[in-house]
Amino acid sequence: MKITVLGSGGWGTALALLLLENGNDVTLWSYHQAESDTLRTTHENPLLKGVVIPEEMKFTCDLAAVKGCGLVVMATPSFAVRSTAAQVKDLLDPGTIVVSVSKGIEKDSSLRLSQVIEAEIGDKCPVVVLSGPSHAEEVGRHIPTGVVAAADDPKIAEQVQDLFMNQRFRVYTSD
């Protein structure tokens, strides 16, 4: 599946690697061009020391990378979730699954970040929350991890489960 991960911090990079290893076509989006260039040339994220990013990973600073994706992962810092969701709203294909993996709540509204995404993109795309006791460096180093994919529609949560899960990354579902 064509997937774009929005946010190239440690968590976004670790999940992009996981999705790539699971056989998907993955693009990792960075807000800063210099960051994207560094990832492309060094094949390492400074936040995940020693974890090699394969040549197959694509890098961009262009939000149009979400066009044609079956899945978009929102891994931006919490303060950037609303603005990023607003910018990609018109670029997303209807039905694209949007997975919220950023932790926290929005400062001014006290909304969960999944609610912020839903407020910005409306009902155009289903939103799934992927969360649990997990750390980027552990996922990047292939340490066994368990998380939950929660969605209003259990079938959508199961689709996310299928895309993310492997022998070391266990995904449970919830509605």
Q: Which residues does each predicted region cover?
A:
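NAD(P)+-binding Rossmann beta1-loop-alpha1 motif at the extreme N-terminus of oxidoreductases
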Residues: 1-52, 58-61, 87
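Short, hinge-like loop/turn segments at secondary-structure boundaries
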Residues: 43-48, 115-117, 144-148
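Rossmann-like NAD(P)(H) cofactor-binding subdomain of soluble oxidoreductases
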Residues: 53, 59-67, 71-144, 160
